[in-house]
Swiss-Prot record:
Originating organism: Dictyostelium discoideum (Social amoeba)
Enzyme class: hydrolase
UniProt cross-references to Pfam families, sorted A to Z: Peptidase_M16 (PF00675), Peptidase_M16_C (PF05193), Peptidase_M16_M (PF16187), PqqF-like_C_4 (PF22456)
Annotated cofactor note: Binds 1 zinc ion per subunit.
Binding site for Zn(2+): 74, 78, 155
Coiled coil regions, renumbered to chain: none
UniProt key word Iron: no
Low complexity biased stretches: 1-10
Protein name in UniProt: Insulin-degrading enzyme homolog
């Protein structure tokens, strides 16, 4: 008893020493605890949360892989989810999380590995018990090892044609002899060996030690209860007193390198990587002066005087981006990417010369002052994140801060301006300290001599010589390069407009005139000076080739014309704006400080309603859209099969090849006249939520209504997406080759049409999906190893309900995927019937489904996004409440009948459309296999219009009656 009291007293003393700095707008309760085994834990108590979360991060990642077993750290991350001594059933944890409304994941980065989950609050302790056992007694059974090898191999195969992974790999490979040059993901060629289980266990035993781990536990419980959980479940993790391996500095050891490589997608870019090995400049440790962040902001600026502005006005570049990355203290790098135009492609040396000219400046203090002001406002008006985002951020920050007290404020901790640090970083941005990747889809085709072994990247490599330096120096100094001016749009008025009494205010209609409707909700809960505005464009024509091409051109024209004067300045103030070209409609989303959001939107709509471009601008946006369309052919196969599914099942008939052909022919005058005509008959529905008054919302409605030559469109003429009415007792297969000749994966998207939307059917769909998703994943991915991408979920696009299964595989054919899917649905009846024998489990299923579909939002941004999703789905801002009630009324008999009527392969109501994509190395069968008494159809390419015309469409009206 005395010992326990002494232990409690000691813990109380330690807590007094560590008090986490907390935002005045954050009502969570926090506690830092260091367990006896050396494990550092942050506890977060949020008495309002519906979901709980835990994240464990370990300061060991892919950089610690043994050179002879590349990918081992990533493979271990996979293995820890597959059974422990306490919970030996392989998918015990995964199934528990899914059945209790949660999600989980693991990520392996170069310097750390993260494991995290969310779950319904009531199941939190049980989830912690299962989760913590990963780090105490994992099984890593031999058969699980062999199966998960296939999963890792499939994951790599899924990434092989993605240029992000390819660029990263070919650049890192140049740090010869350094751990950074290793193949981080791993595949069967690096991991398939007789002793792989022994090696993965050895890696775990060597590095997985409590003193290298950080944990964050987030729940509704009190801090004392959460601390009890921490001791109960994480104290048994062994402290082996392991040190993170001392790795060599990341540096250029000989000459700078030029890599010339072929991308997968249509792109021409230059990527510059500058390693910075100086430990005192470590980016993640210099968070109180943000020197790397300020330098990145200046170099990546897009307004007048910036490098991008010069390149843009010379028609050399479409875009420029910069990132600063820190792995360990002696491993930092700055990366700059420039996407080139056709003109820029012919002037690469001048582009490089201008890049190095742009590095020559002294940093004025106003860049720091602006960043500090924004940081202070964001800290003062702190907005909660989703539980999993919170736990991941906290564990990550624990590794970076000087003192645990600073963990929560890590990203908002600007204290001193350090121009000397910025100057030191600049000193590493030299032509003799870089790797340059020239990544071009046209320049090097058929002209490369080397092949990278893991991603099959075709490339050339040469050292950069003094003659290159001299050539770049020979370009005259460009007088248009200078430091951009101070930001003219800094927020001035951040006054909160409503009392923060935590009352809920559903958006209400406050303006309705001449085809313009505005809905408004003033925030009383989140104490944020920001607002969100969403605008739906209600169009008389949409979904065809012409409209899709024109809207893509318009989207590019926004940044083309407005970026330098206003949009970029706003973007650095946490202003986000997206013109979304969706299957259902077009919408503009905007989120920003309330005192500038309507000014920005006014400028945007003035541009849209008075659209004009010069010839150079139109040429450039047309080139951008052409690249985007061509790159769409190189998406992952599962994304392409989903696109084919949409093409054949909805009243939008925009085929990618047709869009490309139409784009080639369209002229500037046709583009301008199209929107002049379209905007003469258009309606708008807008939602204003957050720190904006009714007067602000109504004034914005008046702005939308004031445009000359605009008339309201008749509601019956406004485009509405509708779903094809698939025939009963019929399976329709659509087969097509993939465009990418190097793609080795196939994919199938299989849709079971349920019918028109109604509330009971939708609620039943949500209930059955809460079982289906994990069961389908376990069967086709875990057990049968069909591939990395396996998913089953509901889809209500076009106000019709369907169940959609997606699989991508490099080891199976689409026919095998389809057969396995149908076999799964035959066996799924037994899974359902279990709940008939266990009413208590069915009751739990219903309750968990309710919780999963009505999660409390943690911020103004998240809440407003949820409101908008309900409005665009069914026009009812309070649909969440109805959904909760409807799910609660679903019985087992409802679920079983739903299965028998719509999903059982034996039903006469079966309505399936299956879109299959084949690599060009495959043979597409000419016939389709019969399936019992079900009629089976086969469609080929270009038959979508006839198919839709023959079958007609379901009504797109939403029935909100019970």
């Amino acid at each position: 008893m005395v010992a326990n009291e002494q232990q409690q007293q000691q813990q109380e003393e330690e807590r007094k020493e560590v008090k986490l700095i907390q935002s005045p707008n954050d009502n969570n309760k926090y506690r830092y605890v260091k367990l006896k085994n050396g494990l550092e834990v942050v506890l977060v108590s949020d008495e309002t949360t519906d979901q709980s979360s835990c994240c464990l991060s370990i300061n060991i990642g892919s950089l610690c892989n043994p050179r002879e077993i590349e990918g081992l750290a990533h493979f271990l991350e996979h293995m820890l989810f597959l059974g422990t001594e306490k919970f030996p059933v392989e998918k015990e944890f995964v199934n528990f999380i899914y059945l209790n409304g949660g999600s989980y994941n693991g990520t392996t980065s170069p310097n750390k590995t993260n494991y995290y989950f969310t779950v319904n609050q009531e199941s939190f302790e049980e989830a912690l018990d299962r989760f913590s056992s990963f780090f105490i007694s994992p099984l890593m059974n031999e058969d699980a090892v062999n199966r998960e090898l296939n999963a890792v191999d499939s994951e790599h195969n899924n990434n092989m044609q993605k240029d992000f992974w390819r660029m990263d790999r070919i650049v890192n490979d140049q740090f010869e002899g350094h751990p950074m040059s290793m193949f981080f993901t791993g595949d069967s060629s690096t991991l398939k060996r007789d002793d792989i289980r022994e090696k993965v266990v050895e890696f775990y035993q060597r590095y997985y030690s409590a003193n290298l781990m950080k944990v964050c536990i987030f729940g509704r419980e009190s801090l004392d209860q959460l601390e009890e959980y921490a001791n109960k479940y994480f104290l048994p993790i062994v402290n082996k007193d392991v040190k993170v391996p001392k790795l060599p500095p990341l540096a250029i050891t000989s000459k700078s390198i030029m890599i010339e490589a072929e991308p997968t997608q249509d792109m021409d870019l230059l990527k510059f990587v500058f390693p910075i090995p100086d430990e005192k400049l470590c980016f993640s440790k210099n968070y109180k002066n943000a020197s790397a962040s300020i330098l990145s902001h200046i170099l990546g600026h897009e307004c007048q005087g910036s490098l991008f502005s010069v390149l843009f006005n010379k028609d050399y570049a479409f875009s420029l981006s910069i990132s600063s990355n820190s792995f360990y203290e002696n491993m930092n790098k700055i990366e700059i990417q420039i996407h080139l135009t056709k003109t820029g492609l012919e002037n690469v040396d001048e582009v490089i010369a201008l890049l190095f000219q742009s590095f020559e400046f002294d940093t004025p203090e106003y860049f720091f002052t602006e960043k500090k002001l924004l940081s202070e406002i964001n800290w003062k008006s702190f907005q909660k994140s989703a539980p999993a985002s919170t736990t991941q951020a906290i564990t990550s920050n624990l590794f970076r801060v000087e003192r645990p007290e600073e963990t929560l404020k890590y990203n908002n901790f600007l204290e001193q301006f350090a121009p000397e640090k910025i100057k030191e970083i600049q000193s590493y941005l030299r032509p003799d300290n870089m790797i340059c990747l020239f990544y071009s889809s046209t320049k090097f085709k058929g002209k490369t001599t080397e092949i990278e072994p893991h991603y099959k990247i075709k490339f050339n490599k040469r050292y950069i010589e003094q003659s290159d330096f001299d050539k770049w120096k020979s370009f005259p100094k460009n007088t248009n390069l200078f430091l951009p001016k101070e930001n003219p749009f800094l927020p001035i008025d951040t006054t909160i407009k409503a009392p923060q009494d935590h009352s809920i205010h559903i958006p209400k209609e406050v303006y309705n005139n001449n085809g313009v409707k505005v809905y408004h909700s003033l925030d009383h809960r989140f104490n944020s000076p920001k607002a969100r505005v969403n605008i739906r464009f209600e169009l008389t024509s949409y979904g065809n080739n012409q409209s899709m091409v024109m809207w893509n051109l318009l989207k590019k024209s926004l940044k083309e014309v407005l970026n330098e004067k206003i949009l970029y300045y706003l973007s650095v103030l946490d202003f986000s704006m997206k013109l979304q070209i969706l299957t259902t409609h077009v919408e503009l989303q905007c989120y920003c400080f309330n005192d500038i959001i309507f000014t920005a939107l006014g400028k945007v709509f003035d541009f849209l309603m008075n659209l004009d471009l010069n010839d150079m601008q139109f040429k450039r946006i047309k080139e951008k859209v052409a690249k985007r369309f061509l790159s769409s052919h190189y998406l992952s196969p599962y994304q392409i099969s989903m696109r084919h599914l949409s093409l054949h099942n909805f009243n939008c008939n925009s085929m990618l090849l047709d869009k490309q052909e139409y784009l080639k022919k369209v002229t500037k005058s046709e583009f301008l006249n199209y929107f002049k005509s379209l905007f003469s008959y258009i309606n708008f529905s807008a939602m204003v939520v957050g720190n904006a008054s009714i007067e602000d919302a109504c004034a914005f409605g008046e702005k939308l209504n004031s445009f000359s030559n605009r008339n309201s469109a008749c509601p019956g003429e406004v485009f509405k997406l509708a779903r094809v009415n698939l025939p009963s007792n019929t399976i329709t297969h659509q087969r097509e080759f993939l465009y990418d000749t190097n793609q080795t994966n196939c994919s199938s998207s299989i849709s079971f049409l349920i019918g028109q939307f109604n509330r009971k059917t939708y609620a039943t769909t949500l209930v059955i999906c809460s079982i289906l998703g994990s069961a389908y994943f376990e069967e086709l991915r875990t057990k049968k190893q069909f591939g990395y991408v396996v998913n089953c979920a509901q889809d209500c696009t076009g106000n019709a309900i369907s169940m959609r299964c997606i699989v991508q595989s490099h080891t199976k054919t689409p026919e095998e995927i389809f057969d396995a899917t149908m076999e799964f649905f035959v066996g799924f009846e037994k899974t359902l019937d279990y709940f008939k024998t266990s009413p208590s489990d069915f009751k739990d299923l219903i309750e968990n489904c309710q919780k999963q579909n009505t999660v409390k939002q943690q911020s103004n941004s998240a809440q407003s996004s949820l409101y908008w999703s309900f409005f665009t789905f069914c026009g009812d801002f309070e649909f969440e409440k109805k959904k909760y009630e409807d799910i609660g009324k679903i019985t087992f008999d409802d679920v079983k009948q739903y299965y028998l009527d719509h999903l059982s392969p034996n039903t006469a109501n079966l309505r399936i459309f299956a879109a299959h994509c084949y690599p060009q190395s495959y043979q597409i069968p000419d016939e389709v296999k019969p399936f019992g008494n079900v009629k089976v159809n086969l469609l080929r390419k270009y038959e979508h219009d006839n198919f839709k015309e023959n079958h007609g469409y379901l009504s797109s009206k939403v029935n909100l009656q019970k």
